A protein has these predicted regions:
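PLD/PLD-like phosphodiesterase catalytic module centered on the HKD motif
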Residues: 2-64, 72, 89-93, 100-216, ...
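Secondary-structure "cap/kink" motif recognition
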Residues: 70-79, 284-299, 318-320
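Sec/Tat-exported extracytoplasmic proteins
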Residues: 78, 82, 110, 144, ...
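Nucleotide-activated donor-dependent transferases that construct or modify glycoconjugates
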Residues: 79-91
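Segments surrounding the PLD/"HKD" phosphodiesterase catalytic module and close analogs
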Residues: 218-246, 387-404
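Active-site cores of enzymes that catalyze phosphoryl transfer or operate on phosphate-rich substrates
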Residues: 241-287
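Extracytoplasmic/luminal low-complexity segments enriched in Pro/Gly and acidic/polar residues
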Residues: 265, 271-278, 286-289, 311-328
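Long, repeat-rich segments with strong aromatic
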Residues: 302-307
């Protein structure tokens, strides 16, 4: 009897620990974690700002307008990748119908030119991880647009304790089908099932925000998602050979690209600006390298939505100790689409940073329901050209350590 009990315990332990060991060894697919070479590029910086002036809420917004313009002007192809693309929210609040507007424009574009490939990549959060199909994504698909929902099972696990068990014992049942749990994003939307909640709990995502045509490419911190319409954000629109590198980084979502995209050669440009494409862990490498290269008299200006990556926090502190002028503007992390948050991660992380390194100048962006959703760092060096890093990645472990 004791022998049987030991065997049973051993089997249970194996059933627990083998999936965890497997999860610990997962990796992101080939083609991620990219760092291209610097290339000449015609660039334009775009921004969205929401702020209060004389008691009035002011919106200075450029990014969504330029995305629509890029779509309108495309003649040969479009590649689009957005993390949040839905119009689900508490309808007691009021937001512009951005997703509907972009969806209608893409459908019209496809009808106008049926042979032009339009590839649209998004994250399964919009379908609540497979519980249902979001209406706008369904409309795109039904009108001949190639919609790819990122397969998060192919991504590296950030929480092996949970993800190991999920991979071994839950994912095989799928996530489609009705449920009884209220939708977190919209109380009037379809209810979701426990399997989709468990998939959400893996905390994975395709966090990119990219629009590419044969004429220009745009990388942003902004989602077109309706409840994100008033957030403050940054973007860069550019032309040049770096467009090919961005296309290559997006090609990982497709078995085969249409010929118009596969054979695309961007026009060479001559410009005082040089640009490189970086993704996943290479973003951290580039940020870290430039922070470490700063010297007394240099400046670091950081505008950020989430900052909790402990290596970056330490490196910023060490830069301040070297006499680098470090300025940070951060979101208070108190608002999320009508819900009140507790200030995590920024308030505790930056409060501790200020306590340990008093010379760092930290300001909180004053929001009124929206978010300071920016992901932007600017280095002003005394002895070489300035450098900016901006895009879709928050400064968190998941975004910068090859998880998302």
């Amino acid at each position: 009897m004791k022998k049987k009990k030991k065997i049973m315990i051993l089997i249970i332990l194996l059933l627990i620990f083998i999936p965890i060991l497997y999860s610990l060894n997962t990796k992101n697919p080939p083609g991620t974690n990219v760092s291209s070479d610097f290339k000449d590029a015609d660039c334009k910086f775009l921004y969205d700002l929401t702020y209060l002036k004389d008691g009035k809420r002011i919106h200075e917004h450029e990014i969504f307008k330029r995305e629509l313009e890029t779509i309108k002007n495309a003649e040969k192809f479009l590649m689009i990748d957005f993390f949040l693309y839905n119009d689900e929210y508490d309808k007691s609040m009021d937001f512009p119908n951005q997703v509907e507007e972009m969806t209608d424009l893409l459908v019209a574009k496809k009808k106008e030119n049926p042979d032009m490939p339009i590839l649209f990549v998004t994250d399964p959060i919009n379908n609540f991880y497979g519980a249902y199909e979001e209406d706008n994504l369904k409309k795109l698909r039904e009108n001949g647009i190639d919609v790819v929902v990122t397969d998060l099972n192919k991504m590296r696990d950030s929480n092996p304790l949970l993800s190991g068990g999920y991979r071994a014992y839950v994912k095989w049942f799928g996530t489609s089908g009705g449920g009884w749990i209220r939708n977190f994003f919209d109380k009037d939307a379809d209810k979701v099932n426990i399997r989709s909640i468990l998939k959400l709990a893996n905390f994975k995502g395709n966090h990119r925000k990219v629009v590419i045509s044969e004429k220009e490419a745009l990388v942003a911190s902004a989602n077109p998602h309706d409840p994100s319409a008033y957030h403050s954000n940054v973007a860069l629109v550019f032309r040049g050979k770096a467009m090919e590198d961005l296309i290559k980084s997006e090609s990982i979502f497709f078995d085969k690209l249409p010929d118009a995209i596969e054979n695309f050669k961007a026009e060479e440009v001559t410009s005082p600006y040089k640009l490189k494409v970086i993704t996943e862990g290479k973003i951290y490498d580039e940020i870290s390298k430039n922070i470490k290269e700063t010297k007394k008299g240099d400046e670091i200006n950081l505008g950020i939505f989430y900052l909790s990556e402990f290596r970056i926090l330490r490196e910023l502190g060490e830069a301040a100790e070297r006499g680098v002028d470090v300025k940070i503007i951060a979101d208070l992390n108190k608002d999320a689409f009508g819900l009140e948050k507790n200030g995590s991660p920024n308030r505790p992380a930056l409060s501790e940073l200020k306590e340990d390194y008093p010379d760092i100048n930290i300001r909180w962006y004053q929001t009124s329901g929206e978010q300071f959703h920016t992901k932007f760092i600017y280095f002003k060096f005394k002895d070489k050209n300035p450098l900016a890093i901006l895009g879709s990645a928050n400064y968190t472990r998941r975004n910068l350590d090859n998880y998302n």
